[in-house]
């Protein structure tokens, strides 16, 4: 399973750049393997992302903005969903991955199952 993060390398928006760096930095720091897919430099990436963000997750007007997160081709969410999962120590579940033993998320899951 590969986590794919759709980003825009040449975004003029500081807010988008900050959100992208936040997601990528978290994945790197936690040694979660991922691929960056640049929608600014690759039209195929842009088209695929726009077509695969579910209708109910799209903005009322315009296109979905990066970062958008997928596990293989399964949509996992945008930055706001990622941020909420991180705040709740549930990023691995959000990404569709198993939390590593000893992580806060694994401990929380063990308590829930007990």
Curated annotation (Swiss-Prot):
State the residue spans of region: Required for interaction with HER2. 13-50
- Provide the leader sequence positions: none
* Ranges for region Required for interaction with PFN1, HER2, and ATG12: 54-71
State the compartments where it is located.
Cytoplasm, Cytosol; Cell membrane
First-listed, main subcellular location of the protein, grouped into a coarse class: cytoplasm
Q: Which GO terms describe its biological process?
A: positive regulation of cytoplasmic translational initiation; proteasome-mediated ubiquitin-dependent protein catabolic process
Q: Which GO terms describe its cellular component?
A: cytoplasm; cytosol; plasma membrane
Q: Name one GO molecular function term.
A: SH3 domain binding
Keyword field? Cell membrane, Cytoplasm, Membrane, SH3-binding
Span of the annotated motif SH3-binding: 61-67
In terms of InterPro entries, this protein maps to: Glut_rich_SH3-bd, SH3BGR, Thioredoxin-like_sf
Instruction: Describe its function.
Output: Appears to function as an adapter protein that bridges proteins together or proteins with mRNAs. May function as a ubiquitin ligase-substrate adapter. Additionally, associates with translating cytoplasmic ribosomes and may promote the expression of specific mRNAs.
Q: Relay the domain remarks.
A: The SH3-binding domain is buried in the tertiary structure, and it therefore unclear whether it directly mediates protein-binding.
Q: Quaternary form?
A: Monomer. Interacts with PFN1/Profilin-1. Interacts with ERBB2. Interacts with ATG12. Interacts with BECN1. Interacts with translating ribosomes.
Its family remark reads: Belongs to the SH3BGR family.
Protein name in the entry: Adapter SH3BGRL
Query: What is the organism field in this record?
Result: Bos taurus
Protein encoded by which gene:
SH3BGRL
């Amino acid at each position: 399973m590969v986590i794919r993060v759709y980003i825009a390398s040449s975004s003029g928006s500081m807010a988008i750049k900050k959100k992208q760096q936040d997601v990528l930095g978290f994945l790197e720091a936690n040694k979660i393997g991922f691929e960056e897919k640049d929608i600014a430099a690759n039209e195929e990436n842009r088209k695929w992302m726009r077509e695969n963000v579910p209708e109910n997750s799209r903005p009322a007007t315009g296109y979905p903005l990066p970062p958008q997160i997928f596990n293989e081709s399964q949509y996992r969410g945008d930055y706001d969903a990622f941020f909420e999962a991180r705040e709740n120590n549930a990023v691995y579940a959000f990404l569709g991955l198993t939390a590593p033993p000893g992580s806060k998320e694994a401990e929380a899951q063990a308590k829930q199952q007990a």
